[in-house]
Each structure stands twice: as structure tokens, then as C-alpha cells.
Amino acid sequence: NKTVHSTTERALMCPSCGHVIYPRIVPAVIVGICNDDKILVTKYRTGFAHYALVAGFTEIGETLEETVQREGLEETGLRVKNIRYYKSQPWGIVDDILAGFYCDVDGETDIHMDESELKLAEWKTREELELQPDDFSLTNEMMLMFKNGRM
């Protein structure tokens, strides 16, 4: 039989057997790695052409904070500390839930970029930071908060 929308929760249900199918939600993090008055910005190797922040998906058995640490290390070779949750944003086009975090670089500040994933990774001061016009993404909001000295 065809599934139908449940009337009591966000799910699909088989009207014959009552089996409930819940939506799959994929958690991911966006990470503003700070180094005093600088923030680390990246550009992806393919696709999106504007500045971004370190980001990645949470693996099974991993906390969001562990994802922040792993993605920082994998994409840029940087260790991080003082991880602070900022806010979250559903990404309606797909099944992602994005969680934004700020953190501080821990120790060495030299970037060792993952060239298979990124074409650029560099520190930018608040004054140097370029934002995307009319962009309401969590990434752009986090860069704006940093640029305005509110993070």
C-alpha cells in the first residue's frame, strides 16, 4: 500500500500494518575557528565559489563537539579548543540540520589545507572578511557576527 502522512507526528505511515517511517535527519557542523582577531575562511575545491567556514557531517557515534574537532583537523590541520555552540539552522533543501560553533585555535596556527576538499584556507581579520550579499545562511550569519565583533 501507499504510505500516508501521519496525523499525529511528522512521519509516514502504512495504513495496512501501521508501520511508521520517520524522516532521516543528517547533522552537520559549521565551525568558526578564531585566532584572536582573525577567523579561518575556506573555499571549496568545487561548487560554491564564496567564502565559507570549516564544515562537515557528524559521523555515527560522534558528538557535535567531536565533529568540530575532527573537521578542523581534517580540513586545515588545526587543533581547536573552547568550543562554543552558536545556533542551528535546518537546511530545507535536503535533510540536514546545521549546528554552528565558534572555537579557538589550540596551539599551532599554520594551516595545512586538505587540497582534495578545499582550494583556499586562510586567516582573515574582521576588516578583510567579505560577506555574501543577501545571504541568510548560518555560515554568512556567523561570519557577520565575527566581522561585527559580536563573537
Which residue ranges define each predicted feature?
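Nudix hydrolase/Nudix homology domain
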Residues: 48-51, 114-151
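Hydrophobic alpha-helical positions that pack around
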Residues: 68, 72
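Active-site-adjacent beta-strand/loop module that shapes the phosphate/pyrophosphate-binding cleft
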Residues: 89-112
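Cys/His-coordinated zinc-binding microdomains
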Residues: 1-2, 18
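N-terminal strand-loop-strand
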Residues: 8-53, 57, 79-85, 103-107
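N-terminal phosphate-binding loop and adjacent alpha-helix
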Residues: 63-64
